[in-house]
């Protein structure tokens, strides 16, 4: 039997922070953490339980699915409760044995029985337990959730809770949305203790209904149109206007409608038209509209289909068109991008939600009364934490010249001349095309590049994407000898064809392209724009603008750096996988690949996709290094969180096999760019500011159980900076290699 690698994250190593040579400036920073104080003991009751048939300890997903299915029944008997090991914990005393049955649909329908014995003993959670007892974490999380749910001003959307009384609207000619300021909370186990992390999170909804969205499509009876609507809407989040609930769309049903779909209400079968009138006092205007399907399970685990009427549902999130509306995005930024001092103040307003005295009804307790009942107090943590600024290094351009980040021009390290290239432009943008070529030529001299005049391809005004693509195929189509290195598409008012052109370039025909908007040639600073275009094209042609002057300490390790990122493709229920690997010591030459994975066999395809890429990348490295393989591989894996580590089991085993068979050490690092932490510097006037790039947080607020660190990767001039989190997951690494990893991360972000 093949022994699989155990999925356990690396423990935090011992590091002498003061003696490292990769940072030189120690700072104290604020973190958005809150302190929890218990004014009295919390009593928990322990209940042993067993599940039949037995679920193995390794079957975490089955165990989680079982508890999720049975949770409603457990709450009816035990109130707020949680599972830890083979014990159920509750703040409610139950003195009899209880059995809970449910069905799970795994490989067939399986009935499970959870038998919970009467309470075995009591456990007290005290103030000193908060920072050391894992049970205290789950207990406090339940209490905070209970306190927040007592506030009638709050509406809950998965992990986000928003204040419905602070609803705001933004409307432009193209976009109309409502959004609610809100928060996310999570319990953090840090080096200094356990604290509550609170971060601001806004929830955005389309102002129109899903009915409006569906009816913007023509010919709803067409199978092709229905397929497009399903691809656009499935897996999207939505809320109903008549309740504080949100759901995920599983399907759009075009073969049923509110008039034909029935529901059992008080033992009487009625259609949805009558149900909405009786249950919610809502009159359905269009009785023949399609229905939204949400798949759930009942208390026994049996499939339960919920049907919703699009007239009463609103989509959450922004549509793609919204991000193209400059005025809208500016207005949204004004309301949501808070500079550090304002953000700290807004974060601390979380306390007012816990201490709110408004009640749901006369018989219920307010959030403030619940706080008093539990004897809990939550307040902003005033302590500042240690952080370090990493030493800067030189950037080297052509002629071994030092390049400063602020330099607008410099000699390029590895040049790719613009000699054989095409320029597509629309007839009405002729003057812009000429201006583009002249400014590219002018800008090229400062970089030491050569730019010759392109072959011009003039397209008719308002030509379709298909017209542009068919013309491009004359030069880059299958079986045609390629005489041109790349193409620039200059787009005017028809810039909506951008996605089709990039798809044709990258996925269909495989040629290098650069899309330029004609209006960028009509503004001030055209020369600066063309300088940036030149650098982008040079990079796409495998040129190198400059390199980091790494010390021998780094380059002699002969690392290969690999990045893997997954991203869901809304249309077609697919996931895109992008992979890139460095294949030289200076980390300036690359090998890349991509994959498209279907949802139905996502896990199997993904592990093959990643492992296959690593095998190819190692061979490419050997080609560039006289047959020598890399001594170590650092893999940065984005798209999977620490909490989803079991999902990585098969992927890790594949990578482990590939690397061990080739005697290559590897370091597998999870990357999370959407962290809930905010780190700010604080001055003597109690004003907060964003940190500069290169800030490293490697202790203090990091998880005490795992090896993780945070880096502020870029300069932020608007709003608040968000750090990137790195979990060094696998293999064993020495402290020396730890510093090399941190160093390489920062210099390659």
Question: Residue spans of the language-model regions?
Answer:
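N-terminal leader/early-domain signal
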Residues: 1, 252-258, 269, 274-280, ...
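Noncatalytic nucleic-acid binding interfaces
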Residues: 1-357, 361-362
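Long, contiguous domain-sized segments
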Residues: 2-27, 40-41, 48-52, 58, ...
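Alpha-helix boundary/N-cap detector
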Residues: 61, 65, 135, 224, ...
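A residue-level signal for conserved active-site and pocket-lining positions in enzyme catalytic cores
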Residues: 276, 423, 635
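Flexible inter-domain linker/hinge segments
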Residues: 305-415, 524-557
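Domain-scale, conserved, charged regions that form catalytic cores
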Residues: 405-446, 567
